[in-house]
Amino acid sequence: MKFLSFKHNDRTSYGVKVKREDAVWDLPMVFAEFGDKDFNPKTLIAGLQQNQTLDFQEQVRKAVVAAEESGRDEEFKLLFTDIDFLPPVTPPNNVIAFGRNYEDHASELNHEVDSLYVFTKAASSLTGDEATIPNHKDITEQLDYEGELGIVIGKSGEKIPRGLALDYIYGYTIINDITDRTAQSSHDQAFLSKSLTGACPMGPYIVTKDELPAPENVNIVTKVNNEIRQDGNTGEMILKIDELIEKISKYVALHPGDIIATGTPAGVGAGLQPPQFLQPGDEVKVTIDNIGTLTTYISKN
């Protein structure tokens, strides 16, 4: 399943992509009409939280099938052209990112890879697919892109052993870890350089892990104005997904909806010769196999 959150006519909602259609089932409406008893989570985060005790996907499947068989299915669908995409989840807790997890990317920026490099991004930096974000020209001339695979946590845990780590994953998404290289080079920590408004585009979907059975062998392609800048594969990650979860959960309790960005391959603007940073009016597309394409526009003004 592909889950998404959206805004329609000033109403915020969430849903699941209609198969073979550019449309979404509006799940709160579907659940209200066809759901089991009082099961009607109002947000995707609430659905993930309830998934710890109840099979959320099964509840979705049964309700959608009932809607399809009712003959009134069009009442519960919205076309993508009629909605604004939001971040699939807005975590109440953590947006955690791993840096220097691709050796070629670390090398292009002359960074060491012999130690764990972890940082957080402010939840206020999150934005959805097709969003236009500030160009931040008032503070930097070095705004950069980083296409990444994102892990979405599905159940609570800490000190999770590597052998059980994959059980804590609900699904995967796409993240563009937009970075202010000026701030990054002038501060010892990464939080400020990674947390500008709009600096964490995410989406367009959360793809459930059953639909991405080999997340460590998917291509990541980032294009700026249709020019390929990054062309990597998650198989190149230094620390694999189960290792990332084991290492971070040793210190940080994870909860449903928490996001872990797994690092970016080579090809960022700062690593090119000469460097090529994002400019007003640019279009950035990050595509990951079997998830989709995350599009971000840099404001002209």
Swiss-Prot record:
Positions bound to a divalent metal cation: E146, E148, D177
Superkingdom to which the source organism belongs: Bacteria
Originating species: Staphylococcus epidermidis (strain ATCC 35984 / DSM 28319 / BCRC 17069 / CCUG 31568 / BM 3577 / RP62A)
Pfam family name, one: FAA_hydrolase
Protein name as it appears in the record: Uncharacterized protein SERP0556
Metal-binding among keywords: yes
Keywords, sorted A to Z: Metal-binding
Family to which this protein belongs: Belongs to the FAH family.
UniProt xrefs under PANTHER family: ACYLPYRUVASE, ACYLPYRUVASE FAHD1, MITOCHONDRIAL
GO MF annotation, one: acetylpyruvate hydrolase activity
UniProt key word Metal-binding: yes
